[in-house]
């Protein structure tokens, strides 16, 4: 193990950045930013856009750092996560706690200063939901950890909407519901091809507790529900034909993956489905944004 003194500043920075799970944070912040733009017919005020993005990013990073701290022993037993600096003992517990506290404090101040108190408190509640309720309580105790804990991970669009309007109306909750229903099939395909990792770590993920066949069926069922839920922005009048077409096409591909996994499973297929699920959510929310600004131009 390298000592702190022997590490370059760049290496140290990379280690701290790894604690924030940058790729996961990017997707969460992206969905929050989409929520900001959908909340207004025009341009999001710059101070809200920048302040909201930075504040949500910092608090999300703080939550992920706590997750890495709590799960460092578990991460060390799993091939997918053994590389993390927390799992390798390259960053100490006090250092992670201080890092998370700084990120969280600066993030909360940024949201309070540049957006509004509601956004700050909702983001703090999301932090608690992920770092405490999901990480400490749900994940090690129940195979429904992803289903219940998915509520905190689904909040970014509502946070973005609140940052602009100071409220969270029904349309924002539709976006939250989409991510909430997307979360189980997204994580269960990962848990399928990483089942041995979770089994060795003693985590009660669905494939470990209920078996592969049961999990494959539930991936299909949740993907069908997701397909239906993604039609709600069009049904409610929030979005138009551009979004509807995108949602149907993207959802059809996701359904095809879920059906193949249910009928003829392979680890390689599950890997492809997992990667696609990330692309799916990104493109779905991008379609919401394009539709939002295209509708006035198209007169629909």
From Swiss-Prot:
<dbReference type="InterPro" id="IPR044878">
    <property type="entry name" value="UbiA_sf"/>
</dbReference>
<feature type="transmembrane region" description="Helical">
    <location>
        <begin position="239"/>
        <end position="259"/>
    </location>
</feature>
<keyword id="KW-0472">Membrane</keyword>
<feature type="transmembrane region" description="Helical">
    <location>
        <begin position="217"/>
        <end position="237"/>
    </location>
</feature>
<keyword id="KW-0350">Heme biosynthesis</keyword>
<feature type="transmembrane region" description="Helical">
    <location>
        <begin position="278"/>
        <end position="298"/>
    </location>
</feature>
<dbReference type="Pfam" id="PF01040">
    <property type="entry name" value="UbiA"/>
</dbReference>
<keyword id="KW-1003">Cell membrane</keyword>
<feature type="transmembrane region" description="Helical">
    <location>
        <begin position="118"/>
        <end position="138"/>
    </location>
</feature>
<dbReference type="GO" id="GO:0048034">
    <property type="term" value="P:heme O biosynthetic process"/>
</dbReference>
<keyword id="KW-0997">Cell inner membrane</keyword>
<keyword id="KW-0808">Transferase</keyword>
<feature type="transmembrane region" description="Helical">
    <location>
        <begin position="94"/>
        <end position="114"/>
    </location>
</feature>
<comment type="similarity">
    <text>Belongs to the UbiA prenyltransferase family. Protoheme IX farnesyltransferase subfamily.</text>
</comment>
<protein>
    <recommendedName>
        <fullName>Protoheme IX farnesyltransferase</fullName>
        <ecNumber>2.5.1.141</ecNumber>
    </recommendedName>
</protein>
<dbReference type="InterPro" id="IPR006369">
    <property type="entry name" value="Protohaem_IX_farnesylTrfase"/>
</dbReference>
<feature type="transmembrane region" description="Helical">
    <location>
        <begin position="46"/>
        <end position="66"/>
    </location>
</feature>
<dbReference type="InterPro" id="IPR030470">
    <property type="entry name" value="UbiA_prenylTrfase_CS"/>
</dbReference>
<feature type="transmembrane region" description="Helical">
    <location>
        <begin position="24"/>
        <end position="44"/>
    </location>
</feature>
<keyword id="KW-1133">Transmembrane helix</keyword>
<dbReference type="GO" id="GO:0008495">
    <property type="term" value="F:protoheme IX farnesyltransferase activity"/>
</dbReference>
<comment type="pathway">
    <text>Porphyrin-containing compound metabolism; heme O biosynthesis; heme O from protoheme: step 1/1.</text>
</comment>
<dbReference type="InterPro" id="IPR000537">
    <property type="entry name" value="UbiA_prenyltransferase"/>
</dbReference>
<dbReference type="GO" id="GO:0005886">
    <property type="term" value="C:plasma membrane"/>
</dbReference>
<keyword id="KW-0812">Transmembrane</keyword>
<feature type="transmembrane region" description="Helical">
    <location>
        <begin position="146"/>
        <end position="166"/>
    </location>
</feature>
<feature type="transmembrane region" description="Helical">
    <location>
        <begin position="172"/>
        <end position="192"/>
    </location>
</feature>
<comment type="function">
    <text>Converts heme B (protoheme IX) to heme O by substitution of the vinyl group on carbon 2 of heme B porphyrin ring with a hydroxyethyl farnesyl side group.</text>
</comment>
């Amino acid at each position: 193990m390298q000592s702190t003194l022997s590490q370059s500043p760049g290496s140290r920075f990379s280690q701290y950045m790894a604690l924030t799970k940058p790729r996961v944070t990017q997707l969460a912040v992206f969905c929050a930013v989409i929520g900001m733009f959908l909340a207004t017919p025009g341009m999001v005020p710059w101070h809200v856009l920048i302040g909201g993005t930075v504040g949500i990013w910092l608090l999300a990073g703080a939550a992920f750092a706590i997750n890495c701290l709590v799960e460092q022993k578990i991460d060390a037993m799993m091939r997918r996560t053994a590389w993390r600096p927390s799992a390798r003992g390259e960053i100490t517990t006090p250092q992670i706690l201080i890092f998370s506290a700084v990120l969280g404090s600066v993030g909360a101040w940024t949201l309070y200063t540049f957006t509004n108190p509601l956004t700050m408190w909702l983001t703090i509640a999301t932090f608690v939901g992920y770092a405490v309720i999901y990480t400490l309580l749900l994940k090690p105790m129940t195979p429904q950890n992803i289903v219940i804990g998915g509520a905190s991970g689904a909040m970014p669009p509502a946070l973005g909407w609140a940052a602009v309007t100071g409220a969270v109306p029904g349309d924002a909750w539709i976006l939250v519901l989409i991510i909430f229903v997307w979360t189980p099939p997204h994580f269960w395909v990962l848990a399928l091809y990483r089942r041995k990792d979770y089994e060795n770590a003693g985590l009660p993920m669905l494939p470990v507790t209920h078996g592969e066949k049961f999990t494959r069926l539930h991936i299909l069922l949740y993907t069908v529900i997701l397909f239906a839920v993604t039609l709600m922005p069009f049904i409610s009048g929030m979005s138009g034909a551009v979004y509807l077409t995108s949602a149907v096409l993207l959802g059809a591909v996701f359904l095809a993956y879920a059906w193949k996994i249910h009928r003829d499973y392979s680890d390689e297929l599950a890997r492809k489905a997992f990667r696609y699920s990330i692309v799916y959510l990104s493109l779905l929310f991008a379609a919401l944004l394009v539709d939002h600004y295209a509708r006035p131009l198209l007169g629909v």
